[in-house]
Amino acid sequence: MKLHQHLPLLALLTPTLALAGMNDDPVLAKLDVKQLEGAYRDSDTRLVWNLEGWLGTDLHKLVLTSEGSRLDGRSEAQELRLFYRRAIAPYWDLELGWHHEPLAEKRDDRALLGISGTAPWFIETELNLLAGPGSDLTAELNLEREIRLTRQWVLTPEAGLTAHNFTDRNEHQGSGLTDLDLELRLAWEVRPDFAPYIGVAWERKLGDSADLTRASGHDVEETYWRLGVSFWF
């Protein structure tokens, strides 16, 4: 059969193929509760959460994150972020948006520029730059690696490093490297979307921040035992 005899059939198939192509990247939504836990240190028990919700496609997403803690029924720390996430390379995204700390002494609203993705050796990497009033800048680096011990048991080491280019004595924060956070979690994946876990976290103030914290009578390092659950839907 010659090519011109196929043309009517191709004409009929073209709209169907175009519609299928439009649905290759559908709009989806997800809520990921990465951490919902009790953090235990001496006689203190904190409720800690870290969650992310998004709406969009593989290429474009609108993302809202919330992270914070409560002690004795009162919120002691909280961060909200709303940003646009765009895929820029396989396994890598660019993020641009807004960072807000509602519990800060002064209203804390900053612009957010970040990049996140999977580095070699399957290390989940997040690098964020927060720009505040004037020339105030904060840089955050977070690294995480999931190590699957068995089909259900997963060990996750995590590290975080924070730096500032300004001093805030009210928050016992100096300029330069300020915080180092290390954490280790062991999770049991009951289902792919539900996993209870136990863990330990170590937090350390660095540089001038350590000096300001020590001068205020507070500890420069803290260790927490953690018991919690992660889930998504």
Which residues are covered by each model-predicted region?
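Membrane-embedded beta-strands of outer-membrane beta-barrel proteins
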Residues: 51, 82, 113, 141-143, ...
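Outer-membrane beta-barrel "beta-signal"
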Residues: 184-189, 219-233
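Transmembrane beta-barrel strands of outer-membrane/channel proteins
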Residues: 35-38, 64-68, 96-100, 127-131, ...
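Outer-membrane beta-barrel initiation region
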Residues: 2, 18-73, 86, 222-225
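Residues that define the transmembrane beta-barrel architecture of outer-membrane proteins
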Residues: 27, 45-49, 76-78, 107-111, ...
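Residue-level signature of outer-membrane beta-barrel architecture
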Residues: 55-57, 86, 117, 129-131, ...
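Repeated loop/turn-to-beta-strand initiation elements of outer-membrane beta-barrel proteins
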Residues: 59-64, 90-94, 121-125, 150-155, ...
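Detector for outer-membrane/organellar transmembrane beta-barrel domains
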Residues: 107-169
